[in-house]
UniProtKB/Swiss-Prot annotation:
SMART domains tied to this protein: B41, FA, FERM_C
A Gene Ontology BP annotation from the UniProt entry: regulation of intestinal absorption
Protein name per the record: Protein 4.1
Stretches with biased composition (Low complexity): 348-361
Length: 617
């Protein structure tokens, strides 16, 4: 049978397949023609009309799914990857970009003016390379279709952004395009028209994260896959069973009305495929039964995203050559890190988790019990105490120098408590290595603490403070105000709940605590009463940011105490995850970020607290 497939680059691929060929046979031939190895994200679509399509089932014969001849299909992205950077090959990302360009132009992926200009500039950079005034005319952007309603203002903005790019390769431009496109609310959403039980027109959207409900182009509800227990359809009705919430006792079923039985079945199949591909680690098959069975036997027969990533990791071939059709530029993909991590990408924000969240908790069947929950708390306190700058400071006497040397001593207190001699989870060698790494980390941290330097804000605040007194010449008296006090405390605690022993009624914890305190004190003058002054609070500010796996709370307080301005910054980072976390790496990262953000301040206190919960099997 003769087949005709419209590709994403507006070309047509024609071939002849056997009469009993299945959908996977044709898809495999198309991917071989395009030199695509990561083919599981793509599929072949049959278009009923201009807005409605049906995916070709890979496991069934083509002739049973197509009405009449000719056999016309389109090659499209079926499963939009949540993180395109994890795709192995640049050619896969390029075809994903082509699909997203079609989605934008057709209006399926709405964008703001600023986003359209940014994505359009990356499209031009990918197709044409760096701006060259000798090659590119005054309106070279008008040759590209970048938006549904493309205006001259948009083209001028695209040209302005494109001219600012220097030495950005096509692969880097594609990756930047995808990094911005994946943040759009309608990215990868498959839309289906429906009605609610009251007959109000709505649209149901299926994506990698779950089922979305839209009304008048606004999202009014969301059902993530972990909360969906069952998906079913009956005649033209579509039902989802929702897991009960914390305050609920029973499961709830929500129904929707679709235009026809065929539309309800198509929506059900799309939901099953998306749930299986993005949530499960492997596909399951229905065992063949000799008796008549009720219900649909449809199951997603392809590979899941987890299996696709495993297969992609085994790809061992040179980066393939492919032609960018818009400009007819032969492009060779970048190798390795240059494509995945371009040099001009912005660094990870400070509030982002230092450890990537593990997909283990998201994988699997919805409702599967989580066997291990782990919470990591890293608390970093940055404190700066500084004396006001003085114009004329007298040289200290020899007695004062000796007294200060005597007082600048080290007081170290180490308390060790081990309530259990035998660890049920770790060997003694592992415990010794862990403790040695913590001790080495503390030692390196204590040696690398920089001297605090006054910031410009505190200098101005101290100079104009109403609590400071000036003499006749306008100079600050040297005897007034308390001297500089430096304090530094490091506390690291490691607590784990051991697996239950043979006595079922009692849990014996393993507690290991080490405390190290180093204090530097300067001499106090007799007439100084700065410690009795509680100080005056100038400002207090709390900033909280959240990501999918961490919460960062930053509290900034500024006080004036006896003519001394004090700035205290306390940052609390709570990281939750279901995988083993490198505690030392988290601590090093937190200290490093605190020093980079506030180079003129010193870290005085670091507290690491770990909570591990192990449920009964």
């Amino acid at each position: 049978m003769h087949c005709k497939v419209s590709l994403l680059d507006d070309t047509v691929y024609e071939c002849v397949v056997e009469k009993h060929a299945k959908g996977q046979d044709l898809l495999k031939r198309v991917c071989e023609h395009l030199n695509l190895l990561e083919e599981d994200y793509f599929g072949l679509a049959i278009w009923d009309n201009a807005t409605s399509k049906t995916w070709l089932d890979s496991a069934k014969e083509i002739k049973k799914q197509v009405r009449g001849v000719p056999w016309n299909f389109t090659f499209n992205v079926k499963f939009y990857p949540p993180d395109p950077a994890q795709l192995t090959e640049d050619i896969t990302r390029y075809y994903l970009c082509l699909q997203l360009r079609q989605d934008i132009v057709s209006g399926r992926l709405p964008c703001s003016f600023a986003t359209l200009a940014l994505l359009g500039s990356y499209t031009i950079q990918s197709e044409l390379g760096d701006y060259d005034p000798e090659l590119h005319g005054a309106d070279y952007v008008s040759d590209f279709k970048l938006a549904p309603n493309q205006t001259k203002e948009l083209e001028e903005k695209v040209m302005e952004l494109h001219k600012s790019y220097r030495s950005m390769t096509p692969a880097q431009a594609d990756l930047e395009f995808l990094e911005n496109a994946k943040k759009l609310s309608m990215y990868g959403v498959d839309l289906h028209k429906a009605k609610d039980l009251e007959g109000v027109d709505i649209i149901l959207g299926v994506c990698s994260s779950g089922l979305l409900v839209y009304k008048e182009k606004l999202r009014i509800n969301r059902f993530p896959w972990p909360k969906v227990l069952k998906i079913s359809y009956k005649r033209s009705s579509f039902f989802i069973k929702i897991r009960p919430g914390e305050q609920e006792q029973y499961e709830s079923t929500i129904g929707f009305k679709l235009p026809s039985y065929r539309a309800a079945k198509k929506l059900w199949k799309v939901c099953v495929e998306h749930h299986t591909f993005f949530r499960l680690t492997s596909t399951d098959t229905i065992p063949k039964s000799k008796f008549l069975a009720l219900g649909s036997k449809f199951r997603y027969s392809g590979r899941t995203q987890a299996q696709t990533r495993q297969a992609s990791a085994l790809i061992d071939r040179p980066a393939p050559h492919f032609e960018r059709t818009a400009s007819k530029r032969a492009s060779r993909s970048l190798d390795g890190a240059a494509a995945v991590e371009p040099a001009d990408r912005t660094p990870r924000p400070t509030s982002a988790p230092a450890i990537a969240p593990s997909p283990a908790a998201e994988g699997g069947v919805p409702g599967a019990p989580v066997k291990k929950a782990q919470k990591e708390t890293v608390q970093v306190e940055v404190k700066q105490e500084e004396a006001p700058p003085e114009d004329a400071e007298p040289e200290p006497s020899e007695a004062w120098k000796k007294k200060r040397e005597r007082l600048d001593g080290e007081n170290i207190y180490i308390r060790h408590s081990n309530l259990m001699l035998e660890d049920l989870d770790k060997s003694q060698e592992e415990i010794k290595k862990h403790h040695a790494s913590i001790s080495e980390l503390k030692k390196n941290f204590m040696e690398s603490v920089p001297e605090p330097r006054p910031s410009e804000w505190d200098k101005r605040l101290s100079t104009h403070s109403p609590f400071r007194t000036l003499n006749i010449n306008g100079q600050i008296p040297t005897g007034e105000g308390p001297p500089l006090v430096k304090t530094q405390t490091v506390t690291i605690s490691d607590t784990a709940n051991a697996v239950k022993s043979e006595i079922p009624t009692k849990d014996v914890p393993i507690v290991h605590t080490e405390t190290k305190t180093i204090t530097y004190e300067a001499a106090q003058t007799d007439d100084s009463n700065g410690d009795l002054d509680p100080g005056v609070l100038l400002t207090a500010q709390t900033i909280t940011s959240e990501t999918t796996s961490s919460t960062t709370t930053t509290q900034i307080t500024k006080t004036v105490k006896g003519g001394i301005s004090e700035t205290r910054i306390e940052k609390r980072i709570v990281i939750t995850g279901d995988a083993d976390i490198d505690h030392d790496q988290v601590l090093v990262q937190a200290i490093k970020e605190a020093k980079e953000q506030h180079p003129d301040m010193s870290v005085t206190k670091v507290v690491v607290h770990q909570e591990t919960e192990i449920s009964e099997e």
